[in-house]
Amino acid sequence: MQYKTFLVIFMAYLLVTHEAEAIWSFLIKAATKLLPSLFGGGKKDSSKRKRDVEDFFDPYQRDLDLELERLLSQLQ
C-alpha cells in the first residue's frame, strides 16, 4: 500500500514540475526503442524527413551566408 501511495505522489510531482520534461522524454525515447512497431516505421522515415528539411533550408542558408559575408566585407 505504501508503494502505491509513493508512486501516486511521485507521478503527481512529475506532472507539476518543469524538471519532469527530461524524465518524460527519456521514458518516451526508451519506449520508442523498445516498441518500434507501435511508434512508426523507424529510422528510415526520420532520416528521409531530416534530409528533406536540410534540402529545403539549404538554399536559404547559402543566401544568408553570402549576405553576411557581403555585410562583413563592407564593415572592414
UniProtKB/Swiss-Prot annotation:
Its main location: secreted. Coiled coil: none annotated. The keyword Signal applies. Residues 47-76 form a propeptide. Amphipathic and cationic peptide with an alpha-helical structure in membrane-mimicking environment. Belongs to the non-disulfide-bridged peptide (NDBP) superfamily. Medium-length antimicrobial peptide (group 3) family. This is Antimicrobial peptide Smp24. It comes from Scorpio palmatus. The lineage of its organism: Eukaryota, Metazoa, Ecdysozoa, Arthropoda, Chelicerata.
